[in-house]
């Protein structure tokens, strides 16, 4: 049985329209975990799975406005797609980590106004193909996933510790 993620990869849509480019022309950044399995990229931001956290979806942002560079967005890929359906693209979902509810609502509304017909069509295709509904309260959902998240199992590369000055805990 194919997974939802495998079915997503097989869909003939431009994933870049969802802010999930399939290639990162910039190469790996210091904060990308060593074992990250990329889902897609939005500039320097990588959306990925980390095997030590199962089906959970993460964002890795070297220019993060939060106090961390790697943070969870969804419990699983299905919920991640539902978040994208609620927000139009992955961008507003990734921004939740440093926003309050009002700022998120303003950002999501502004981003929705900028969506192209092609972006809307890509999201509609996802919804049609998978029969999923948009996440009802994306802000609350993501904040709940991030609350009390234990990132101690993230497998950072040596470069992460060199750049941040943090000590590796073995």
Which stretches of residues belong to each language-model region?
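A surface-exposed partner-binding patch
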Residues: 1-65, 91-92, 98, 109-170
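Compact, glycine/acidic-enriched structural inserts
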Residues: 59-100
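Core mature regions of organelle-targeted
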Residues: 102-106
